[in-house]
Amino acid sequence: MKKTTFLIVGKHAVLEALKNPNRNIERVFLTEDTKKKLNRENQNLNLFKKINVFYKSRKELDNLCGRDEIAHQGLVAEVEQLEDITLKEFILQNKKNDVNLIALEEVTDPRNIGSIIRSAASFNLDGLIVKERHFPSESKLMYKSSSGAIEHLNIFKVSNINSTLKYLRDK
């Protein structure tokens, strides 16, 4: 069964998604100027080899991204959602005794969540616990705000934060 896809935008978000072996990229849209800029910056363009790449104008990318008014930086990718791992599975698979997690409750702004994800990844945290009802999992804005860090952090969606924290305390 084919998963649904969504768009992520921005240089860092798209390049990190391309580097993630667990992420399925359907296609990438970029401008000729962006391709030249990536070549000048010595970005590894081998990432684009096994992916459908479509060259578009900035106006076409603006239309593709919709009315979100997010700066796509000439680079957009259509991706599938990552496979979710449950917190219990992660705890069982994890070999180390100390697991460092951050829990968010009632944080719904995609920019704030993206910034928290970026900070959590920079501190090498193992994951982020979020309430599944309040997590904008397919938000272009969240992916862009995380600057691609979301590709390096486990996101655990739970129904009840309090019971999850009690479960973790008892482990």
Feature names for model-found ranges:
Residues 1-92:
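N-terminal positively charged helical leader segments and presequences
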Residues 23, 92-171:
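RNA substrate-binding interface of SAM-dependent RNA methyltransferases
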